[in-house]
Structure formats: structure tokens, C-alpha cells
């Protein structure tokens, strides 16, 4: 039977119709039991799940932004809770907030800080560019939980999300401040310690492998000898410099926009509010926080996030180089370079029995790619500020905090599951040295570049070593030749031939 014109043909027996999977949580206004409460805001009434601590503005945001499965990172939820906790205390000290309400707000904010209310933050990352939806999500959760603590009902506004929890604040100064605070905390508590562990592991291997001489490589071609420890010392220095780069970004992150409110002028906030809140936050978090020197810059731009992301990208580039080198050095086990032995962590192939792959290094490389991509997004976001406000804050926050978390976990894992367990194949390293045609470099200062090049070419054609060809040609006494071609001497600064000479590329 033919289908009607314009209609889809019936699905044949045995065919499975694809189902669209939406990466969003349950729609607002419904719970597993279907119970809901009715709330009102300036746009009208809307159903909110009866047991939800969030309110109508959060429900609207969930409905408006069914974009992804990405939610505000835990580190930022914690930072928002810290800001609301400190603001309630300062507003009480300034005489603007009833002490009983303030105490309930601080208790609820502490629960947000501790992660006990994380399931009450359903708003998508791809939302309003100022992050207002996430600020109001925080205000509503804290207000409703505080009202509950005071014996009120959810949605009663016994504690008001705007008038009480958001007092003296605007999304435009709270969200940038929360991003800065979250990034600083994660850098100090997670990233720097992880990078230091990786640096320590690489430095220890540099010392352990220092006696082992091997062939160096440039352009993926054989070059003059190098000690394996010297190679690892280069990796350690890359990480050491990466730590310094990240630490240099910390002062910029330490400037908080709090106190600027809507456009940086500080409208509707007490002159001492920001200073007091930030001082309290600095004391609680041990982070180097201070009020922004210029509130207009702090809200209209986010150059500090771009700067920090640039430092993270540089660390990612370093990790990519190191991880890739270790993959190559450990390639084999029989037909590759195989100069080092990487720890075996899991079977590597579903078809080739006994194969073991450098999976930890590959994981690090993928993290590096992601962080580099995140930096591109943050850079583009940083360009999107118009006049008094940058409106890419949630996506910049997501990418920056993800980069910090990924680099921290990858560095820790790289150190513990790979670098700390690396061993060297000394025989393999030693065997490759004599085979290198680049050994003729040490002869060039004494016999000349062209003569040394001829020896290298003949060695290549005949399959002999540079030493064997030089001995056959009797260009130098054997004792002198042995002195010049001593691999260890070639790994230290010095004039092996008695005068300077080029060392190739």
C-alpha cells in the first residue's frame, strides 16, 4: 500500500525508530510525584516543583534554556554561597538586615558552600550572559531554605531572594566575583599542588637517569648524545615555569568586582559593603582577595580570565609535549625507540593479545587539547563585552574552571600512574649511540665540517659507525679519536676538538 503524498511511509517491521534524547533535566513545575506550588514574579505566575528550594525565576530559566547537560560548576556554586554568606553578615553589621533573618541566610548559605544543595542548581550554562539566572538561582535557594529554617513555607518569601539575600549586590558584580573566587580556590587547592607533584616526579627521574647517555634527536632525526636525565630535567623545568605562569595570574583573579552593582558605580550599596565582604571572604578562603581598583573595568571586561586561561593553555602545551615525548621514548616494545619503559596500566587492544598502550600519556594529551580549545572559547568570550558589561560570563566560567580541574587531575594522574613508575632501558640507550651518524659532529672542529660530513656519508652508505670509518681512514690517532667520540664528554659544554665548531640543527 502506497503512502499518501506528503506523508511519511510506515516504519517497516523490524526497524527501530530513533528516539531523541534531550540533555536536560525534568521540566520545571513537575516532580517525580507531580506535586507543584504556584509562584509569582514580575512576569506572572508559574508552577515550581513543590519540594524545590529554587523558585519561579530559576524555573523560568530552566524552561528558557533547555540547551545542554552542562550546569554551573561545583566550585562556582561554592563561591556564590560564600559571597551570600559574607554579604548577610556584613549587611547585619551595617544595620540593614534583621539578625534573625541574617542568621538563617548564613545557615542556608553554608549548606550551599558545603554542597548539600547542589541538586537545586538546574540552570544551564548557556543562559543569560551576565549569569543573572544563576545568581537568582542562588538567591532563591538560600531564601527558601532560610525561610524553612525560620518555620516558613517554600515560596512564601518570608526571606526574600532580592531584598534580603541579594542586598547590596547585582548579578553584574556577584557573578564576576564568584568566577574569580572559584578559579583562585581551585588553582590554590588543586592545580598548583598537582603541578608541584608532577614537577617533583620529573625532577626525581632527571636525577635518577642522569648517568644514562643516549642519542639526542632533532627534527625526529639522530643528533648528538644527551643524557636521559638531561631530557627529563627539561620536562621538569617546563612544569616549574608553568607553575610560575599560573601563579602570576593570581593577583588579577584576586581583584573582585563586588561593590560595583549594576554598571560599576556602586548604586544601592553601602560604601563599606564591598571592602568588608571581601575582607571576610579573604579571611575565610585564605585567598589574596581585594576590591577592584576600577569597578568599571572589573565588570565591563574579563581580561583576568583571559590572562589566566592563557597561562593554563601554556601548561597544557607543555603537558602535550612531555606526554608525547614519553610516548615516543617508550614506543615498542621491540620495534620502536623503547628507551624508557612506561608503567603497564591496562590491556591495550581488543584484537591484539598482549598489547599495552601508553594510555595515561594519551589521556594527558586529550586534556591538553580540551584546555587549548577552552582557551579559544574564553578568548572569544573576552572580546564580547559591550560598554559596561561583558555578557559571556557563564561560558567563560565553565571553560576556565573545567581547564583548571582537568589540568589538576591530569597532572596528578600523570605523576602517580606514569612518571613515578618510568624505568630506563640502559642497554637500548647505549646501543643507539654508536649507530648515530651525528657522532661526527665532535670531529668537525678538528678535521673540518666537510671532512666530517664525508665520514658520515660513508658510514651511512656502508652501514658502519662513524668510529669505524674514521679508524679505517686513519684521520686521527685512535686515542685521540676515542677522546673526541666519548659520548659522556659530548653531553657537557666544552671544546672536544680544542676549538669551537658548529653543532648542527
Give the label of every model feature segment:
Residues 2-505:
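Conserved, well-structured ligand/cofactor-binding cores
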Amino acid at each position: 500500500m502506497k503512502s499518501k503524498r506528503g506523508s511519511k511511509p510506515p516504519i517497516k517491521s523490524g526497524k527501530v525508530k530513533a528516539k531523541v534524547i534531550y540533555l536536560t533535566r525534568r521540566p520545571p513545575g513537575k516532580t517525580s510525584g507531580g506535586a507543584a506550588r504556584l509562584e509569582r514574579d514580575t512576569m506572572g505566575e508559574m508552577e515550581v516543583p513543590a519540594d524545590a528550594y529554587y523558585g519561579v525565576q530559576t524555573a523560568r530559566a530552566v524552561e528558557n534554556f533547555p540547551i545542554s547537560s552542562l550546569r554551573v560548576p561545583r566550585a562556582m556554586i561554592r563561591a556564590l554561597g560564600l559571597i551570600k554568606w559574607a554579604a548577610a553578615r556584613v549587611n547585619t553589621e551595617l544595620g540593614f538586615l534583621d539578625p534573625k533573618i541574617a542568621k538563617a541566610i548564613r545557615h542556608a548559605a553554608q549548606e550551599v558552600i558545603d554542597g548539600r544543595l547542589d541538586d537545586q542548581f538546574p540552570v544551564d550554562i548557556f543562559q543569560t550572559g551576565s549569569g543573572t539566572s544563576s545568581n537568582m538561582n542562588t538567591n532563591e535557594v538560600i531564601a527558601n531554605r532560610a525561610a524553612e529554617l525560620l518555620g516558613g513555607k517554600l515560596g512564601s518569601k518570608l526571606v526574600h531572594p532580592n531584598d534580603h539575600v541579594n542586598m547590596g549586590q547585582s548579578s553584574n558584580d556577584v557573578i564576576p566575583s564568584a568566577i574569580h573566587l572559584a578559579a583562585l580556590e581551585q588553582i590554590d587547592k588543586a592545580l598548583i599542588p598537582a603541578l608541584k607533584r608532577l614537577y617533583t616526579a620529573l625532577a626525581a627521574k632527571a636525577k635518577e637517569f642522569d648517568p644514562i647517555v643516549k642519542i639526542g634527536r632533532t627534527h625526529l632525526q639522530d643528533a648528538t648524545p644527551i643524557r636521559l636525565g638531561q631530557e627529563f630535567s627539561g620536562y621538569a623545568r617546563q612544569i616549574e615555569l608553568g607553575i610560575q605562569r599560573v601563579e602570576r595570574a593570581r593577583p588579577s583573579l584576586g581583584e573582585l568586582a563586588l561593590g560595583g552593582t549594576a554598571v560599576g558605580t556602586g548604586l544601592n550599596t553601602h560604601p563599606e559593603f564591598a571592602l568588608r565582604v571581601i575582607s571576610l571572604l579573604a579571611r575565610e578562603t585564605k585567598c589574596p582577595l581585594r576590591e577592584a581598583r576600577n569597578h568599571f573595568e572589573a565588570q565591563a571586561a574579563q581580561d583576568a580570565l583571559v590572562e589566566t586561561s592563557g597561562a593554563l593553555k601554556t601548561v597544557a602545551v607543555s603537558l602535550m609535549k612531555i606526554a608525547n615525548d614519553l610516548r615516543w621514548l617508550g614506543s615498542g616494545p621491540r620495534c620502536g625507540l623503547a628507551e624508557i619503559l612506561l608503567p603497564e596500566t591496562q590491556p591495550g587492544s581488543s584484537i591484539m593479545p598482549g598489547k599495552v598502550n601508553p594510555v595515561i600519556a594519551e589521556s594527558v594529551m586529550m586534556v591538553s587539547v580540551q584546555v587549548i580549545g577552552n582557551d579559544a572559547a574564553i578568548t572569544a568570550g573576552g572580546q564580547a563585552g559591550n560598554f559596561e558589561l561583558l555578557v559571556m560570563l557563564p561560558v567563560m566560567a565553565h571553560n576556565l574552571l573545567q581547564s583548571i580541574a582537568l589540568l589538576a587531575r591530569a597532572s596528578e594522574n600523570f605523576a602517580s600512574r606514569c612518571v613515578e613508575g618510568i624505568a630506563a632501558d640502559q642497554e637500548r640507550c647505549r646501543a643507539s649511540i654508536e649507530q648515530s651518524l651525528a657522532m661526527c659532529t665532535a670531529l668537525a672542529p678538528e678535521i673540518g665540517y666537510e671532512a666530517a660530513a664525508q665520514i658520515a656519508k660513508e658510514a651511512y652508505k656502508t652501514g658502519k659507525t662513524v668510529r669505524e670509518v674514521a679508524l679505517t681512514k686513519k684521520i686521527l690517532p685512535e686515542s685521540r679519536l676515542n677522546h673526541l667520540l666519548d659520548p659522556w664528554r659530548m653531553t657537557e659544554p666544552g671544546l672536544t676538538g680544542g676549538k669551537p665548531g658548529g653543532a648542527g640543527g
